[in-house]
Every structure is written in C-alpha cells, then in structure tokens.
C-alpha cells in the first residue's frame, strides 16, 4: 500500500509491536478497505505532511503516527472522499498523542492538505488539556514567525491559515 502502512501492519502482525486483539482486527479492517480497487493513496501528500510536520515541529514521528498520516491520505478515486474519516487514538501517557494532535491539526489547516476552511476545534476533558495542543501550534508559529506570518494569523484564542481560511481553536 505505502511503506508507512505496510511497515506498521507487518510489525503488528509479526509481533514486533505488542498489541491488543483490537489493533490486530484494525489491521484487517484497514487491509480490507485498502483492497478496494477504487482506493488511491496520495503518496506525495503523505511525504509532504511528514516532511512539514517533522521540520516545523522538530520531531521524528513514531510509526503509529506515520500510519495515521498515511491513512488520512487514502481516498476513493470516484468521489475524492476519504476512506477513513474517523481515527480513535487510545493509548497510555507518554506516547506523543498531544504532540501529534498539535502537528496534525496544524498540517490539516494548510494548503498542502488541500481543503479550504478545514476548521479544527480541539476538545479535551479540561480546558487546560485542550489548550496544550493549541499552545504547541502557537509556540511553533512564534518560533517560525518570520516565515509563518505570511501564511497564518494568530491570537491566543484562534490560529487562522490565511490561504485556506482554516482555523484551529
């Protein structure tokens, strides 16, 4: 399918990554969906997403994050609709969930994702928790503001991509 998908599926199925039966079932479901001849995987978009996220957020993405990014870019040729429209990320502390949400939220607002007005409201169990990811994006923009100011408008409440009119709040 794509190296990020294949590698993760092989690691789960081969036992290299410890996983639950539900994760193994998810691999079967992903394979079932991707075997549809109407599915296209947009490799260039995957590569660009990974490049931008790792460069701007100064991180190296985990294998599970690479899998999710790849699955985000699977579409039906006939409708250009996404194959996977919901993702549940449920894991213990310290596996990069907040950092990933920050980076992927930012990427999804860019013209590289290609969707106008792709708006993101970050929701969590508490306002403090929800602000963590928002603040990660805000700080990244602050750090790169000489370049980012051409593409984003930011306040402490909302970040707007000027080209796509997408926001994060």
Region locations from a protein language model:
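Phosphate/NTP-binding elements of NTP-utilizing enzymes
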Residues: 1-169
């Amino acid at each position: 399918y794509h190296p990020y998908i294949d590698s993760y599926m092989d690691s789960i199925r081969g036992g290299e990554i410890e996983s639950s039966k539900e994760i193994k079932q998810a691999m079967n479901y992903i394979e079932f969906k991707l075997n549809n001849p109407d599915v296209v995987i947009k490799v260039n978009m995957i590569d660009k997403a990974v490049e931008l996220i790792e460069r701007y957020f100064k991180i190296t993405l985990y294998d599970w994050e690479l899998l999710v990014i790849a699955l985000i870019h699977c579409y039906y040729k006939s409708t250009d609709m996404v194959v996977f429209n919901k993702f549940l990320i449920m894991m213990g502390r310290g596996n990069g969930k907040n950092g990933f949400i920050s980076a992927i939220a930012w990427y999804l607002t860019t013209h590289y994702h290609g969707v106008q007005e792709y708006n993101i409201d970050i929701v969590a169990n508490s306002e403090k928790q929800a602000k963590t990811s928002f603040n990660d994006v805000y700080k990244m923009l602050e750090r790169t503001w000489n370049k980012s100011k051409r593409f984003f408008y930011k306040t402490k409440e909302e970040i707007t991509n000027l080209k796509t009119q997408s926001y994060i709040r």
